[in-house]
Amino acid sequence: METVRISGKKRLSGEVRLQGAKNSALPLLAAAASVDGVSVIKNCPRLSDVDAAIKILRFIGCRVWREGGAVTVDATGICRCDVPRELMCEMRSSVIFLSPLLARLGMAEISAPGGCEIGLRPIDLHLSSLRLMGAEIGTEGGVLSCSCPDGLHGEKITLSFPSVGATEN
C-alpha cells in the first residue's frame, strides 16, 4: 500500500464529520432484515435509494423510523418473503434483500432490480454464489423464486472478476 507523508512545522489536529454513504447504508439496511431484533444505522443519508430500501423493509414487515441522522429497523415482525416489482424497481441495488430474506425466512421472491443510468446490472454473480451456499433458484415471468430448504451454509467462492456488489449479498 502506498503512503503519503506530509511534513510541516505545525501538527494537524481536529475532527472532520463525514456524511453517510449510500453504498454503505443500503447493505446495512438490507442486513438489518436478517436479524430478529433491532438495528440502528447512524449517519444514514437522506437519499431516494435509502427511502426505497426503507419502503421494502416496511413492506416485508419491519418497523422503521428515522431520528435525526439515524434509521432504526425493528425486524422482529418480518412476515413476507416477497418484494413486489414496483418496490424492486425503485433502486438498482434492491437485489441485496435476497440473502437476508433467504437467511431469515428460508425463501424469497423478487423481481429483477431497478434501473440505473449506468446500464444493466447483471445479478448472475449473486445467484451463482447463493447456489453454491445451498439456495435453489428458479425464474418465471421475471420473478426469482428462491429457497434454501437446508439453510444457507458457508462456502469458498471465487468471483470471475472483481465485484463489490456481488459481495454485498
Regions found by a protein language model. Name each.
Residues M1-N169:
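Structural preference for solvent-exposed beta-strand-turn elements
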